UniProtKB/Swiss-Prot annotation:
It comes from Ovis aries (Sheep). This is Interleukin-2 receptor subunit alpha. One of its GO terms (molecular function) is interleukin-2 binding. Disulfide bonds join C24-C64, C49-C77, C51-C79, C123-C168, C152-C184. InterPro entries: IL-2_rcpt_alpha, Sushi/SCR/CCP_sf, Sushi_SCR_CCP_dom. It comes from the Eukaryota.
Amino acid sequence: MEPSLLMWRFFVFIVVPGCVTEACHDDPPSLRNAMFKVLRYEVGTMINCDCKAGFRRVSAVMRCVGDSSHSAWNNRCFCNSTSPAKNPVKPVTPGSEEQRERKPTDAQSQTQPPEQADLPGHCEEPPPWEHEREPLKRVYHFTLGQTVHYQCAQGFRALHTGPAESTCTMIHGEMRWTRPRLKCISEGANSQAPDEAEPPESTEAPPGSGTFLTTRMAGTTDFQKPTDVVATLDTFIFTTEYQIAVAGCILLLSSILLLSCLTWQRRWKKNRRTI
């Protein structure tokens, strides 16, 4: 087989999938006196398999995989003790459980979230695995199309001016979270006047905001203080970097096609001379 064809196959199966990955690179918006829930996870969502001190994760991440007819977490998170005297723990099969709050620093809301449904193409919250580092501080890598639902914390009530949810979507060529139209005020406070303009909420989580998708860089595509150095399935998709990666993929594809054409033309001319 020609070297150019080998390079082409390597490009298609290795390089291209990494270039087209669609991941949300920002945290969901942070609202004052409110918290958000994730009722269902889109296919492609990843969760870091983090372990307590003294334990080492076997798998780096757990990924939601499937299609419109069936979806499930394709991996098991479990932790092995770093001490040879201890036996490895038994893995926990991912499954559904009651949804937890993403911000334990905020009190539990008195408003019940929308009822969770088992829909194809989505994964539910997996249960904690044994020796998990902090079940309430899991690091998620959301994908395009993910929606989170907001509700006011206990002691606050909502002034709805629109949908109390945020969705990761493509806006002007960039993946961004839509702004939830929710304002939470104290239960004893007077309602806001209808004509009073509500200040826009930031779509970026400020430092110490309580969202547990903290990263080394701004975004949800990095890991939260890993306890061991493991090659992971990070999706390094940021606005500028994503465009550069796509341009690089196109350039590499063009170069390989050109090399293939030149090789085929050279072989064709050589065969004609021999005839």
